[in-house]
Amino acid sequence: MNKKVTLVTGLWDIKRDTLEPGWNRSFKDHYVEKFKDLLNVPCNLIIFGEEELKEVVFEIRSEENTQFIVRNQDWFKNEFYEKIQSIRTSEQWMYNPLVMSKMFLLNDARIFDKFQSEHLYWIDAALSTTVSMGYFTSDNVLDKLYEKVNKFLFICFPYEANTEIHGFAYPEINIYTTDNVNKVGRGGFFGGPVDTIGDVNAKYYDLMSTTLNDGFMGTEESLFSILLYQFPDLTCYSLIEENGLIYYFFEKLKNNEALFHSEVKRGNLEIIDYRKVALYVITYNSPDQFDTLCKSFEIYDKDYLDLPKRKILLNNSMDRSTDDKYKELCEKWGFEEIKKDNIGICGGR
């Protein structure tokens, strides 16, 4: 087992057994049991949790390859907590503060690490729900990570968004990148060389602060997706299947088939804030033509109708018999009508 690579995890009882069906899971019967699968992996392990979790840990592990850091749930009520609570719509009251703090926990592990690790990777405590721990105990994937990864790694799956990316509004998420976000960085396993973690953590902190202040929130995976596009010099990713199951990455890694990529830096492109875009249409005596234009938008590129903050019809018509039809169409397509008589195309601009 590679002693230069340490896994980092944490486990807290956030009372998911009290949530509605579909979200409820027993802490003891599900999370603790799956956590024990991870505890049986004989690698160096840094664990965050409340005091009572230590008994579970050291029934299985020794102090030699384990560092337990007591971290109570009050720690998650940090400077972002109230902002998260004001934005969230779900009743999963501690879920978002916890998952969005994984990066901070990984960085804390870097600071307190007693093993002097060269690589650190966050791993969800219950990842064995979908990923066999045999990849770590038998298939030497930690050795392969150490050999192949020289940037901060995210495992990503392709995602064609319509309205959101894990709760983060789309296309508004593109405000923070110079490209269209079409992949999601998984939160179950991420990390890399120790000397990359502090930088990525700082970028993540700034991004969380900015997006929350702008009124946007998804999960940690939404922010991971943005980081890939913003900082390709610091990050890399390996692509898995659309179902998002992380085992695919470890299977490829085991067989020396995993590929690692970085996003292409787009240069100093101006970032377009879609919330500040307006659409202007100039028309003259032809409401049917205006209607046809809007129908073509609806069929071929609905973003023209959905994204602009304002849609304005500059009506240059002199034929007053068209007024009622224009009024009807503006209500239909959500346009604000401005009448200036016939001021021409240049005057309209």
Which sequence ranges carry the predicted segments?
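Short loop->beta transition adjacent to catalytic acidic/histidine clusters or analogous donor-positioning motifs
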Residues: 5, 40-45, 66, 275-277, ...
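Short, well-formed alpha-helical segments that are part of the catalytic scaffolds
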Residues: 17-38, 53, 286-302
